[in-house]
Design a protein with these regions (language model features):
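Active-site-adjacent substrate-binding region
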Residues: 218, 225-227, 232-248, 400-443
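Midchain, well-structured core segments that form catalytic/ion-binding scaffolds
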Residues: 102-105, 145, 152, 156-364
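A short beta-alpha structural unit
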Residues: 16-20, 262-264, 298-309, 348, ...
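His/Asp/Glu-rich mid-to-C-terminal helical/loop segments that flank catalytic regions of hydrolases
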Residues: 157, 223-240, 270-272, 318-324, ...
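Acidic/His- and Gly-rich active-site-bordering loop/insert found
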Residues: 2-103
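Zn-dependent metallopeptidase/amidohydrolase metal-coordination segment
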Residues: 7, 11, 335, 342-355, ...
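Active-site metal-coordination/substrate-binding segment of hydrolases
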Residues: 64-146, 151-162, 202, 316, ...
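Acidic, glycine-rich active-site loops and adjacent beta-strand->loop/helix elements
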Residues: 76-78, 139-147, 169-172, 211, ...
């Protein structure tokens, strides 16, 4: 990395150093050792908790002792993805970087700017002798990428700060002040196997080609849910014919809107052509309903060999009614930030596992009570259908506070420096900030960062000019922090 071309030099110096240290999620020992050694070399107090989270403290510069204590926070792990032709060893090899125009990239791997640039910014501030600031604490958390492990493990009393600035956002000029918490509600229908009538018409029906997407970021975009569309058609068949259901399968990940779903069914042979007509009519209906958001939607219906066994009729009836009734999509919009989803639910997957039909749903909200309410709505729909239902403990959200004092400082600073107002946003997905707020409810927070693109992939890149703007803004915020 040619540091001379990069500004601010100190930030890119430490980013280059961090790139030399392997730091996959759950294998952060080397970067932890680097950070502890850095603190010792700088003569700064450093504490490490049982999870591996590190807190490095730096006293206020002269004349700034009366400012509130600021916690700068990043996570130290990175997503390790590489191209198929790369021989990179993430446990031992440094990340090789190069400059492409205004972008910093890595050779065939993830760059690790998520969240290495946050770390580098913290280290540059901790090492600086010419930056004014009040009392500082720099929090470095472990294993954010695979489960927010460090944030979950953080104990009360580990930090003393009043204000927390998360450095893990990916769009310069945008300030985030809220995120969703979440929980999964897991449903199980027990069923009995019954003999399937062998003289019936057996067929597989499938819904495919849907856009899908993230169950938080994309839940408000009116994209179709393959499980919902499939169940709607199966319900029509069950209402018209002597209907048997042999198999059902849809969706995969709890945090993804399902793109495909299929079922293996049977009806009397005399209704073979009726079912095909029903399918054509239904396909035209849903193509019309989702003409904008689902241009590649398609259905398939094909003959299959007879199944020996089917799901008992009572369970099928209760299953189809429950899947029809359960909420999917936006449940409530934020009253603090127009256009932001506050609460939602995702009907994520329907699987047949170990003699049971297992359904996974995911609820999100920036308000804990609303998330619990959403989970109870889902629970009620399935309990009415006779299923066993369990909801996970989940993780907390971060309710937006547009009146935040540190947000006002950040907005005023940005306008003063760059002549435009930053965008204030919240995200309908999980961030570490929600967990911090649960244990330190007094914290005044916002999240910021330079522009990154292609994160979590070998296409990850960082916009070099954005780093300089992010740096200048952060330093100006630090010197204008409210007094104690």
């Amino acid at each position: 990395m040619e540091k001379i071309e990069l500004k601010p030099a100190s930030v890119f110096h430490y980013f280059a150093e961090i790139c030399k240290v392997p730091r996959p999620s759950k294998k952060e020992e080397k970067i932890i050792a680097y950070l502890m050694n850095f603190a010792e070399e700088q003569g700064l107090e450093a504490n490490k908790d049982e999870a591996g989270n590190i807190l490095i403290k730096k006293p206020a510069t002269p004349g700034k002792e009366n400012l509130k204590t600021v916690i700068l926070q990043s996570h130290i792990d990175m997503v390790c993805e590489k191209n198929s032709d790369s021989n990179h060893d993430f446990l031992n090899d440094p990340i090789e970087t190069y400059i492409d125009g205004e972008w910093l990239k890595a050779k065939g791997t993830t760059l690790g700017a998520d969240n290495g640039i946050g770390m580098a910014t913290q280290l540059a501030i901790l090492a600086a002798k010419d930056i004014e600031h009040g009392p500082l604490e720099c929090l470095f958390t472990v294993d954010e990428e695979t489960g927010l492990t460090g944030a979950f493990a953080l104990k009360e009393g580990f930090m003393d700060g009043d204000i927390l600035i998360n450095l893990d956002s990916e769009d310069e000029g945008e300030l985030f002040i809220g995120c969703a918490g979440g929980a999964n509600t897991i449903v199980e229908f027990a069923y009995e196997e019954i003999d399937a009538p062998q003289d019936y018409f057996f067929f597989q029906v499938a819904v495919k080609g849907l856009t899908g997407g993230h169950s938080g970021d994309d839940i408000s975009k009116n994209r179709a849910n393959a499980n919902k569309l499939l169940n709607r058609f199966l319900s029509q068949l069950a209402a018209k014919y002597d209907f048997y259901l042999c198999e059902i399968d849809g969706g995969n990940l709890h945090n993804a809107i399902p793109r495909e779903a299929r079922a293996l069914c049977a009806v009397p042979m005399k209704h073979k052509e009726d079912v095909r007509i029903d399918m054509n009519i239904y396909t035209a209906e849903i193509e019309n309903e989702f003409s904008v958001t689902e241009p590649n939607l398609r259905t398939e219906l094909g003959s299959e060999s007879p199944c020996a066994k089917a799901i008992d009729r009572d369970t099928v009836a209760r299953l189809l009614k429950s899947l029809y009734a359960v909420h999917h999509g936006v449940y409530a919009w934020s009253q603090d930030m127009p256009g932001l989803v506050e609460t939602s639910s995702n009907l994520a997957s329907v699987k047949m596992i170990d003699g049971k039909i297992k359904i996974v749903t995911s609820q999100r909200s920036s308000i804990l009570s609303s998330r619990k309410d959403m989970s109870e709505v889902v629970r009620s729909a399935f309990q009415l259908g006779g299923a066993e239902v369990k909801t996970s403990d989940g993780y907390p959200g971060w309710k937006p506070n547009p009146a935040s004092p540190i947000l006002k400082v950040a907005i005023d600073s940005y306008k003063k420096l760059f002549g435009v107002e930053p965008k204030v946003k919240a995200i309908h997905a999980g961030l570490e900030c929600g967990l911090f707020l649960e244990k330190y409810p007094h914290l005044d927070m916002f999240s910021t960062g330079p522009t990154l693109r292609g994160v979590h992939s070998p296409d990850e890149r960082m916009h070099i000019p954005a780093v300089d703007k992010f740096w200048k803004h952060l330093l100006d915020v630090l010197v204008n922090v409210p007094q104690k």
